[in-house]
Amino acid sequence: MSGPLQGLKVIEFGGIGPGPFCAMMLSDMGADVIRLDRKADKGKDRGEGAFLASGRRSVLHRGRRSVAVDLKSPADVQRVLELVDGADAIIEGFRPGVMERLGLGPDVLLARHPRLVYGLSLIH
């Protein structure tokens, strides 16, 4: 997609609310947005139900790629770090402290990639 943000790569880390909305807007303006989704776990749909999941997701998650990862798996965390190394920005929407517990907090990511823009959206 073309737009003023064409050529920028953004990694979206989970959550609901403002994070996916922000990622949608960046994608609409041409950024290459990669959403990190949880690997299928026991058929959970994040408590949204089929109706809400299909309607909201089809709107909010449009225009971006998705990678399924298990952020508690060392191999998948390494894959995520490799994605971040090639990114321009991060959008993080987890509860406070989650990224740090996963070993992916701002200190770790910014030490690896000092020019990274780290966007944090807290709703909790």
Predicted regions and their residues:
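N-terminal helix-loop segment corresponding to the beta1-alpha1 unit
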Residues: 1-123
